[in-house]
Amino acid sequence: MGEIHPALDRGEFEGMLRSTERGYWDKHPFHQRMHAGELGPVELRVWVANRWYYQRNLPQKDAAIVANCPLPEVRRRWLPRIAYHDGVADGDGGCARWLVLADAVGLTRAEVIDERHLLPGVRFAVDSYVTFARTRPWIEGVASSLTELFAPAAMAARTVALRQHYPWLDHDALGYFDSRINRAQQECVDALDIVLSHCTSRPSQDAAVRALEFKTDVLWS
C-alpha cells in the first residue's frame, strides 16, 4: 500500500493551492504579447470569439456544482454565480458584457453566438471543464474555481494593457473586466473558505490541488 501522508494544516494547504499560479494563463505567450501591445485586431477578435465559449458555459459549470452539492449552506453561497453570468434580465450579466466587448473589437454578435470561429481545442477544453464539474465530487468543482485567486491581478494588468496599447478599442467596452475584478476578489475568498473547511484529509486536499491544476490547463488552452 502507498504511504499515507498526514493532512496539511490550513496555511500549508492554502500554500499548495496558491502554488498552482505558476500555470496560470497570464504566463501564456499569447497573453504576454497582448499585454505588450503586440496583437493585431484580427488576433484580438479570435481571442474574444473563442473566450465567449468559456464565458457562456460558466453558468452551466456552476449549476453542476450546485446540483452535486448536498449542503444547502454551500448551495446558497454558490447560486449567485449563476445569476452573475446569466444576469437577472436580458442584456444583463457577465455574458452580456462580454458581447459588448465583442462589438468593440469588430465582431458581430451573430458570429460570436453561432461560434463559427470556435477552435476545436478550445471547445474540447471547455467541454472537459463542464464535464469535470458534472462528474467529479462537488468540492473538486469548487476547488477548480480557485483560479480566481490569481484573476484580479491578471485582469487588472490586462485592462491596463488594453487601454494603453489598443487605442482603437472603445474603453467603455472593458466593463466586463472592471466588474469582474471586484467580483473575483469576493468570490475567491468565499471559494477558498469552502475548500479549506471541507478538504480536511490529505487525499481530499491532494484532489483539490489536482482540480485546480486541471483548471489552469483549461485556461491555458
Task: Give the predicted meaning of each segment.
Residues 2-221:
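Non-heme di-metal
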